[in-house]
Regions:
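A solvent-exposed interaction/effector surface
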Residues: 2-9, 14-201
Length: 201
């Protein structure tokens, strides 16, 4: 599937993500939530975490779901997509060959377009139908950053990425990729570890 073109720079794209994520407000609930509140503070970055490391990603075959979402429901949308893909893979007896991906193909202040997928060793013999499809994930030269903590706290990470790009005077493609090192379905949200890849021009 061809990637969508953009009319803004990647730095501006990341800035939009940051502004939108920081403007999120919790959804109202009719009953008290018995779970403790999730901290929006990012976990400390460890000295071993890459921040602006140059890497080359190889395209990977992945089963994905595309759609649109608002920032208020971003994490829930991504998790639901992973669940749908996992259910399909379980029925087809397919196993993941790499970490789950969320590819942001277009963003604005209110929401975003996405491709959420799970890499597999090879395309299934019976391709999925309906909401799911098979394609190659983006590859090429990219900068790698690491986020630790809740999804709501990722605006802090993206602000740091924007500052890094500005300081280094680097130009990047108008998209970004999140690779979930920890399972976003099973892991508590405030324990996330996410590789963020910014493709360079």
């Amino acid at each position: 599937m061809p990637r969508l073109l953009f009319t803004v720079s990647a730095a501006a794209l990341i800035a939009v993500f940051s502004a939108a994520a920081s403007a999120q407000t919790p959804l109202e609930k009719s009953t008290p939530d018995p779970k403790p509140p999730v901290s929006a503070e990012p976990a400390p970055v460890t000295p071993a975490d890459p921040f602006g490391a140059e890497v080359t990603l190889e395209p990977r075959t992945f089963i994905y779901m595309k759609g649109t979402a608002t920032w208020e429901t971003a994490f829930e949308t991504i998790v639901d997509a992973f669940k749908t893909i996992t259910d399909y893979m379980d029925k087809q007896k397919l196993t993941a060959s790499d970490k789950p991906l969320a590819i942001y193909t277009q963003t604005d202040e209110t929401g975003f377009q996405y491709q959420v997928g799970i890499p597999v060793a090879e395309a299934p013999k019976n391709p999925p139908k309906g909401d799911l499809a098979v394609a190659k994930s983006p590859g090429g030269k990219m900068l790698q950053f690491v986020h630790r903590g809740s999804y709501d706290a990722m605006d802090t990470t993206y602000e740091a990425i924007t500052n890094y790009l500005d300081e280094k005077r680097l130009e990047s493609e108008d998209m970004f990729i999140e690779e979930y090192v920890t399972d976003p379905v099973k892991m508590p949200e405030d324990k996330l570890v996410v590789n963020v890849y910014v493709p360079l021009k």
